Amino acid sequence: AFMSIFAPYSAQCEGNFDNLFVPFRAVASDVYHKREVILRNGDLGDAVRASMSFPFVFKPIEIDSVLVYDGGIYNNFPVDVMKSDFNPDIIIGSIVAAKLDKPKEDDLMNQIENMVMQKSDYTLDPEDGILMRFNLSDVGLLDFPKARQIAKIGYDRTIAMMDSIKSRIPRELSQDTRQLQRMVFKSKTPDLVFDKVSVEGGNHQQREYIRRQFDSDEPFSDEQAKAAYYKTISDGKISDLIPHARYDKESGMFNLDIKAKVHDQLAIGMGGFISSTSSNQIYIGAHYRTVSLNSLDLDLGGQIGQSYTSGM
């Protein structure tokens, strides 16, 4: 989804977030070096994805060979970034974070939040802008179904404060002018169409197998790429498949770069039960799978123990 939404705009701005219709910054966290990372350029989808990668909930993403997580770990209210990078006339700050509760024995998410979140400064000088504070104590980290409800709360509060906001703005553009600017910008946004596929990871045969799932004699659309993606990971042989869209100015189309991790070919398991009676059982099983020119699955299992019958 991130690639589908953001790849065309990454291509249009040539990896410089200042060239977007609205200049953008994302904040991520490098937990190894214990510091925040300001993302000003690169892949727009990766930047957005990194800024929401809360530890233990979402997998981190690798940017410039560094695993990065949610920027809120070290800076959950980056007013300093806004001022240093943009020096805006007015900042509208939105605070939805609540004071962390004392860790509870039976609340894993609360324990994780207390472990990873650092204290942030949620102050905004009145001369710098307007601060909105929301009480969302009934909304948890994973309450995605409440997204529209939360957005409406923010919208309604903004409309209620619109007079105060407008009083701080020295000039305005008409809706028609802004709409025309937006149309001109979007007219230069390339369509997400692929004509080449490259695969990194695994051995040669595994890369060829994955590439053939996506490759086509003709350019293919984002929807076709999605179908091939889900088909490739559906059999469980691929542990991770990370796609990136890389724009080619000469062709006007995108290269689909895929980073793959393949499960081990051989998996062995055993189990059984031991009792004080003669009904002891031992089970041994092996599963062998290949990802090559032809995908293959083999299962072998056996058990040792006295035969018995049961009924229910």
Task: Write out the residue ranges for each language-model feature.
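Patatin-like phospholipase
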Residues: A1-E223, A227-Y230, S234-L241, A245-Y247, ...
